[in-house]
Amino acid sequence: MYTYYNAHPKGLLVGDCVKRAISKAANMDYMEVQRELNRHKKVTGCANYYDHNHGTHYVEHVLHGVKMSFPAVKGKPRMNGERFCKAYPKGHYILSMAGHLSCCIDGVIYDTWDCSDKCVYTAYKVEPETKYFKILKDRDTYCAHVTNDKETYISAYMDKKRMEAYAQCLKDLGFKEREELLT
């Protein structure tokens, strides 16, 4: 199963499969992924953040993706995107194909083109970044306690009407509201 997905902020079709796959599978912002890959290329020594090998190194060592290899077996068809989706219908995966990275979430490949017939050599199971918020009230003023897996932020204080709009924006961006406060 394939669904069109283009995370590029300007909607451009460019060679950004590494950023697309990571941003979708890990539930990260596209530009945040670009910044992270730029920082990480100092570790790998790659010239470009969009290098396929650099991307898989980042997935394995920074996102702690669990590596699954699919070697060729004589007399049997190779694993491809379509067979992978059927074999692994649940979870977030980054698929390493010949010169390409793609994303599979719950049995659906998300990419700018249908690569489901390409051989999958390696897949990485990743846990998506979880983003939460909690609205706090202090007399007539509200603030949002916003967190992801790495950092915690406190938004500016605002009145109830603005906070309701802000909370809706957070929900639209994929944040989940929590009952308890995270520390």
Question: For the regions a protein language model found, what residue spans apply to each?
Answer:
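Short, mixed-charge low-complexity intrinsically disordered segments
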Residues: 172-183
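Conserved active-site-adjacent core of cysteine acyl-enzyme catalytic domains
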Residues: 41-99, 105-114
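Generic beta-strand structural signal
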Residues: 104-105, 137
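Noncatalytic regulatory segments and standalone regulatory/sensor domains
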Residues: 111-131
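Active-site nucleophile-adjacent alpha helix/oxyanion-hole segment immediately C-terminal to the catalytic cysteine
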Residues: 1-47
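A short, exposed loop/beta-hairpin motif centered on an aromatic-Gly-Thr core
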Residues: 149-162
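Short aromatic-glycine-(Arg/Gly/Cys) micro-motifs in beta-strand/loop hairpins
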Residues: 133-152
